[in-house]
Swiss-Prot record:
Similarity comment text for this entry: Belongs to the Mediator complex subunit 22 family.
One Pfam family from the record: Med22
Annotated TM spans: none
Subunit description: Component of the Mediator complex.
Domain of life: Eukaryota
Organism of derivation: Anopheles gambiae
Keyword Transcription regulation recorded: yes
Disulfide bonds: none
Functional note: Component of the Mediator complex, a coactivator involved in the regulated transcription of nearly all RNA polymerase II-dependent genes. Mediator functions as a bridge to convey information from gene-specific regulatory proteins to the basal RNA polymerase II transcription machinery. Mediator is recruited to promoters by direct interactions with regulatory proteins and serves as a scaffold for the assembly of a functional preinitiation complex with RNA polymerase II and the general transcription factors.
Cell compartment(s), UniProt: Nucleus
Coiled-coil annotated spans: 13-40
Main location per the UniProt record: nucleus
Swiss-Prot/TrEMBL GO biological process terms: regulation of transcription by RNA polymerase II
Name of the molecule in the record: Mediator of RNA polymerase II transcription subunit 22
Amino acid sequence: MQRNLTQSKEALLKSYNSRLKEDIRSMRENFEEIIRLAKGENDTQLSKITQCEQDTYETQVRAANIVRAGESLMKLVSDIKQYLILNDFHSVNEAICSNSTLYRTTQIDRDNKLMAVRDDMAADLYDLEEEYYTSIYK
């Protein structure tokens, strides 16, 4: 069962990684092609108006591809957050246990300090009472 869970996590992480690389590659390639089209140094047999329309259409398609890849990246981030929130009980339990241990240690330390202050105050109060009752100025 544990092995299947580990393999499932590995497969999911590989899937996330491949989606990330694919979307970034798509954004980069489309951006490079838009820049190439912006240079406008194509010597073709098409008329300038036809070439301009073709370049405009290709730029719009590539811009739409960049937007699609960006939306896919946002979905990927959302999926990763959801996965971590819903499935990462081990780290949540570790954090709770470590905080609990820290708070217990702090509580014990404070209790010891309070007891030391109590004992010092009791000893000082005893000394003051003894001094008061043995004083000639009462």
